[in-house]
A protein has these predicted regions:
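Conserved small/polar residues in nucleotide/adenosyl-binding loops
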Residues: 408-415
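Conserved, mostly hydrophobic/aromatic
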Residues: 18, 119, 177, 228
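Catalytic cores of alpha/beta
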Residues: 164, 216-227
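Alpha-helix-loop-beta-strand connector modules within alpha/beta enzyme cores
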Residues: 60-84, 133-147, 192-208, 257-258
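Active-site-adjacent beta->alpha loops and helix N-cap segments on the catalytic face
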Residues: 62-67, 122-139, 156-159, 184-198, ...
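N-terminal small/glycine-rich loop or linker at the start of catalytic domains
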Residues: 3-25, 78-94, 141-153
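Hydrophobic faces of well-ordered beta-strands that scaffold small-molecule active sites
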Residues: 10-13, 47-49, 82-86, 117, ...
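Active-site beta->alpha loop and helix N-cap motifs at the rims of alpha/beta catalytic domains
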Residues: 54-131, 150-162
């Protein structure tokens, strides 16, 4: 290995985002238990295993205690960092919560075994991140505050935009930064450019997270690492591809013997693969895993719809007996997103924009019916949108509803002033 060699950190997503992306977060703690001890011996930088939709799914669908799950994983994985996804001021929910709730959830998450808290805001609004970051920092080094940039494309979303946001993240006290490409919109060239730009501006480790929906994830991870990324998110191969992530084994093999060698053992990973392959077959048989979720769909680059959002849209249309309208809805999503100030499509904005697009199509008239959540998004209840919303549109949607945020008028995050 050369003098410039650096071991690339690998975060395994099999226990959280992989199954959230493929089977709607339905993997049970009982299904995880038999493989936990072996996962702990692989040498992963971290195991993403909690937060995101897991809390909701445990309570709503699996009849499980999410805290008991976390403690169980901690007990069986004493040597590997455990990681969670935290929605900033939305915590693990779908609306804003009070600061003391955010602080307490961070504290209890760390107390129950979390080492890395990946914090993001759907609008890339730094104000919605500061409480969670500060709470993590108060844990006296017990938790890494990793802040995620919600990546998307659109008129305002240039490398300069993301660099300025990364600087604000660093100023807020983050320990590391994650480029979170939830909708698989990154291309290899864009990844290389963005990683280089952020690394040149901010002295923090960079983790790269992208999905396989558009078929570009492996190439993006390769170019990102070559450009200076310090870590990557992957999924063990039976739970990889499609709306999930690049396969762990493939990326380990790609970097083996290079200056970016991960240090992970392919033979050990084969044992992990064998176990999850049995679960994969089980999910096919019981209908949890649909073959469509494993397909590559380059239309993701056009419609900018994350995989989980796609399955949710189809479900809504089926319930309305309008599944033949899926293409129209997918075409409507970017238009709704533009009207709403170009929010990145990630929880909760993906659900809000997607549901409104469904309403616009099935009613036959745009914005004839609006959800309360969409009204709240346009009114600023979720934070400041990346681009200004037309005041006339705001009035049409919100009526007499109080506008909470004065929307930004400059594309540079550092130049924007906000009144609440």
């Amino acid at each position: 290995m050369s003098e410039m060699a650096k071991k690339i950190r690998v975060t395994e997503t099999a226990l959280r985002d992989a199954h959230q992306s493929l089977i709607a977060t339905r993997m049970t703690t009982e299904e995880m238990l038999p493989i936990l001890d072996k996962l702990d011996k692989i040498g992963y930088y971290s195991l993403e295993c909690w937060g995101g939709a897991t809390y909701d799914a445990c309570l709503r669908f699996l009849n499980e205690d999410p805290w008991a799950r976390l403690r169980t994983i901690r007990e069986h994985c004493p040597n590997t960092k455990l990681q969670m996804l935290f929605r900033g001021q939305n915590m693990l929910g779908y609306r804003h919560y009070a600061d003391d709730c955010v602080e307490y959830l961070v504290q209890r998450s760390v107390a129950n075994g979390i080492d890395i808290i990946r914090i993001f805001d759907a609008l890339n609004d730094i104000k919605n991140l500061k409480t969670a970051i500060n709470a993590a920092k108060r844990e006296n080094g017990k938790a890494e505050a990793q802040v995620a940039i919600s990546y998307t494309t659109g008129p305002v979303f240039t490398d300069e935009y993301y660099v300025e946001y990364a600087k604000r993240i660093a100023d807020a006290g983050a320990d590391s930064i994650c480029i979170k490409d939830m909708a698989a919109l990154l291309t290899p060239t864009a990844t290389e450019s963005l990683v280089k730009a952020i690394k040149s501006a901010v002295d923090l480790p960079i983790q790269l997270h992208t999905h396989y929906t558009s078929g570009l994830a492996s190439m993006c991870l390769l170019k990102g690492v070559e450009a200076g990324a310090d870590g990557i998110d992957t999924a063990i191969s039976p739970l990889a591809l499609g709306t999930s992530h690049a396969p762990t084994e493939s990326m380990v093999a790609a970097f083996a013997g290079t200056p970016y060698d991960t240090g992970l053992d392919i033979k050990q990973l084969a044992e992990i693969r064998a176990y999850f392959m049995t679960l994969r077959e089980k999910y096919f048989k019981n209908g949890l895993l649909d073959q469509k979720m494993l397909a590559t769909d380059a239309k993701a680059l056009i419609y900018q719809v994350p995989g989980g959002m796609l399955s949710n849209l189809l479900s809504q249309l089926k319930q309305a007996g309008k599944e033949d309208k899926l293409t129209e809805v997918l075409e409507e999503v970017p238009r709704v997103r533009k009207d709403a100030g170009y929010p990145p499509l990630v929880t909760p904005t993906s659900q809000i924009v997607g549901t409104q697009a469904v309403f616009n199509v099935i009613t036959g008239e745009r914005y004839k019916m609006c959800t309360n959540e969409f009204k709240g998004l346009v009114a600023g209840e979720y934070g400041t949108t990346p681009m200004p919303i037309d005041p006339a549109f705001q009035k049409k949607i919100c009526g007499d509803k109080k506008i909470i945020c004065l929307l930004y008028t400059s594309p540079s995050p550092r130049d924007r002033s906000v009144s609440r």
